[in-house]
Amino acid sequence: MDTPVIPALGGKGYNLVQLTRGGFRVPEGFIVKASAFDDSAASCSLIQKAEDCSGSIDDKCALINSVMDSTPVSDSLRSAIETVLNQLKMNPSLPSPLLAVRSSGVTEDLDEASFAGMNDTILNVPTDVDSVCDAVKACWRSLYGKRSILYRQENGFSPYNTSIAVVVQVMVPSECSGVLFTADAQTGSRGEISLDGVQGLGEALVSGQVNTDHWTVRKPYGSRPMRVTETRAGRQEYKLVSNYPKPGTTRVELSEEEANRLSFTPEQVMTVCKTACGIEEYYGKPMDIEFCFYQNTLYIVQARPITSLFNVPDELNPLKNRSHPVWSPWVCLSDCCLPMY
């Protein structure tokens, strides 16, 4: 994968742009480039103050939060966000009037270390500029949470001299959500897809709050079609749904019948698995994919290379040497664009 632009967009943002350009359905939105954080951090000498602090990591985290809380979003960034929000509001076909604001660290989703889940995601954010700016700042602050700092130290990255972009997307009110691996991370098999799903929003799945349904799907090969080889029900006791018009999510208890219902129909399983094979071919490597369905429409909300697989020799790897789209100076998620400031 072409990595030079990852420092501009963060791993998550870069992958979402690549997915969009590959023709995969990604929720509309825009990206606040990492340089916006860099400018804000420089304006208040944030990194220097963190490195000069002689206290514990907890002391450094408290200092960083205090400095960032007192540093407003710049007028130029606020104006750019307001402009693109107005573009979003003009689209009558959006699935939701709310936004998901997601951290996109510059060391996130790299081939050698994923950093997945280290930084914050803010859900159900209203589309006014004040709410979005507050959510962007919350993502910036999460870069310096204790867990994130320690993870960077343990993986050989600078704990304080780092950066972050922020992805702002339309919030899809997911009826069911899932995580899919296009290879078996335990056995290394490239011939199977591992799929886990839940009813409602995917945050219940990725945080491990509920039992998941599981499918193992054999990939097509030659004349052999794609086929489900294992289905295991997880019995989900509750689901998370949007708390609209208020921020946040609500826990909804499921009836006995609902709890025992599989999160995806057979048709949805085939749809997402076929799409996942296309994403894997597009990237040229096995992928970890997050997705959801709304009104039976599939949305890809994230994709990243699987970092824990052993290497396959090039001559045995049919995914080797795939081409990728040329980068342009615009950050585009569907029809909504924000210039790279």
Q: Can you say where each PLM-predicted feature lies in the sequence?
A:
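Conserved functional hotspots at enzyme active or ligand-binding sites that engage polyanionic ligands
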Residues: 171
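N-terminal beta-alpha lobe that positions the nucleotide/phosphoryl donor
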Residues: 1-167, 176, 259-267, 272-284, ...
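Conserved divalent-metal-coordinating catalytic cores
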Residues: 1-22, 28, 34-35, 134, ...
